Amino acid sequence: MARIAGVNIPTNKRVVIALRYVYGIGPSTAQSICNKLEIPDAKRVNELSDDEIVKIRELIDSELRVEGDLRRETAMNIKRLMDLGCYRGLRHRRGLPVRGQRTHTNARTRKGKAVAIAGKKKVTR
């Protein structure tokens, strides 16, 4: 297994697909990395030479923010919003949707599992 940015990427997959295992590298970024280094689309990780792996590693380290650095930056951005006390920060603090989605119904992913209210019973007529 090749180790890139602290992640063991699978050897039997194509390079464009395998690079996506690194947090912060998606389809377009993986494709642009392969284009810059002139790695063919059909080439698999186990077919890469040591020199090509080193070039990929150097390119990612120099130009991209991935893995721990990216996670830390995202967490710091959210913490900054919460410390400011702005609307988005308050929504993060309360664990509610941040981008204007409705919360009367839905938003279960952000709010957690629905809890029934004890003592509230249906009235029969």
From Swiss-Prot:
Signal peptide: none
GO CC list: cytosol; small ribosomal subunit
Keywords carried by this UniProt record: Ribonucleoprotein, Ribosomal protein, RNA-binding, rRNA-binding, tRNA-binding
UniProt key word tRNA-binding: yes
An example molecular function term from Gene Ontology annotations: tRNA binding
Any one GO BP annotation for this protein: translation
Keyword Cell membrane set for record: no
Assembly, per entry: Part of the 30S ribosomal subunit. Forms a loose heterodimer with protein S19. Forms two bridges to the 50S subunit in the 70S ribosome.
Family annotation (PANTHER family): 30S RIBOSOMAL PROTEIN S13/40S RIBOSOMAL PROTEIN S18, SMALL RIBOSOMAL SUBUNIT PROTEIN US13M
Role, per record: Located at the top of the head of the 30S subunit, it contacts several helices of the 16S rRNA. In the 70S ribosome it contacts the 23S rRNA (bridge B1a) and protein L5 of the 50S subunit (bridge B1b), connecting the 2 subunits; these bridges are implicated in subunit movement. Contacts the tRNAs in the A and P-sites.
Similarity comment text for this entry: Belongs to the universal ribosomal protein uS13 family.
The protein's name in its UniProt record: Small ribosomal subunit protein uS13
Gene: rpsM
